[in-house]
Amino acid sequence: MALPNKFFLWFCCFAWLCFPISLDSQPSRGEAQIVARTALESEAETWSLLKHLDGRHRPGLLSPLLNVLYDGHREPPRLQPDDRALSYMKRLYKAYATKEGTPKSNRSHLYNTVRLFTPCAQHKQAPGDQAAGTLPSVDLLFNLDRVTVVEHLFKSVLLYTFNNSISFPFPVKCICNLVIKEPEFSSKTLPRAPYSFTFNSQFEFRKKYKWIEIDVTAPLEPLVASHKRNIHMSVNFTCVKDQLQHPSARDSLFNMTLLLAPSLLLYLNDTSAQAFHRWHSLHPKRKPSQDPDQKRGLSACPMGEEAAEGVRLSRHRRDQESVSSELKKPLVPASFNLSEYFKQFLFPQNECELHDFRLSFSQLKWDNWIVAPHKYNPRYCKGDCPRAVGHRYGSPVHTMVMNIIHEKLDSSVPRPSCVPAKYSPLSVLAIEPDGSIAYKEYEDMIATKCTCR
């Protein structure tokens, strides 16, 4: 009988010891489920708020990157660009932007967008003659749906790329003949004759070349300005050897078969609010204009010059007397608490300042369409604002007034908050859904200074 009693006692002790462990484990799993459910609900609520926004109001409410986020976990582009075209745009990005992704300050041009389009349709019209240096005449169709109404053309270029870099031992003059064709017409409309533009360019192929740029701004500017969605052109590219200066070039053959179909480069200025406008940084705001009477050197006071001079002298004497009387007074009253006096000038330990927040676009699953930069540091402002906001924050007088109201009159009025005061732009190289490549500069993407407001 003693043995069963001992066994029963041992079993009860064991159950008592194990019971708290089971209780502790169950709440931990429950808390984890609650946290996960809360995170999912928060994310779903955020997405629902974004989806209910009208498309017409999105650009004013959401940042440029959130506009992309709104489009719904953006899928990879339907079409991938050519490797040579992508290599060219990466080279352009390095020339225009720093490693951190901000536009270089030494650039003086006014465009903030560069788009590269590959032809959506092409076919050869006539065979070429390699011995004569004539390439096959090519019909090209470019779709410009990605060009928005707020983007204005500065320059357009036909970009020829090579499979491998090539070089010639003698100078070569290349002539590009470009014919812009009208779209297909219905039977009711009368077709207009195509208009032709011929460009003469001389290239010195002494060095290795991977691409050739031909300026075609003149024929394309009216088409882009009228928002043509499709541009149909015929291109004929001919290179002539300089046989007078180099007789040995007479019997040599051109190796121009490596020249591929051209891409179309559009240098644009995006005038929207989200785009970075370099003109404002090159031309800072002017100071307020003076009064017309002040410009002419006249006094704004209705009195005569002598009376005005007397007023200034009397005011100067009063200022001197007030300063001397203030100097005679004791600096601090005897009953004044120095610790309380200096406390208002002390900055808090966690004072308002900039903090880094480095992320990579692969974390957001955006690296399938954002080519550069690979990492992004938007930075943010965090911390407490001091009672007496000094010049270091550049805060307005309104901030000090709000502090006084909060402490003396109404504590429900919030204290000044730590917020960004200045920003810098961000350069982004991205692949569009149609396979085109876009270099864009976005305004106010990186916080550079904090303030209390």
UniProtKB/Swiss-Prot annotation:
**Compartments it resides in:** Secreted
How does the record describe the protein's post-translational processing? Answer: Phosphorylated; phosphorylation is critical for GDF9 function.
Provide the Gene Ontology terms for cellular component: cytoplasm; extracellular space
Keywords attached to this Swiss-Prot or TrEMBL record, sorted alphabetically, are: Cleavage on pair of basic residues, Cytokine, Disulfide bond, Glycoprotein, Growth factor, Phosphoprotein, Secreted, Signal
Q: Which residues are glycosylated?
A: 106, 163, 236, 255, 269, 337
Molecular functions per Gene Ontology: cytokine activity; growth factor activity
In terms of Gene3D superfamilies, this protein maps to: Cystine-knot cytokines
PANTHER family xref list: GROWTH_DIFFERENTIATION FACTOR 9, TGF-BETA FAMILY
Q: Could you say which protein family the record assigns here?
A: Belongs to the TGF-beta family.
**Under what name is this protein listed?**
Growth/differentiation factor 9
- Its gene name is GDF9
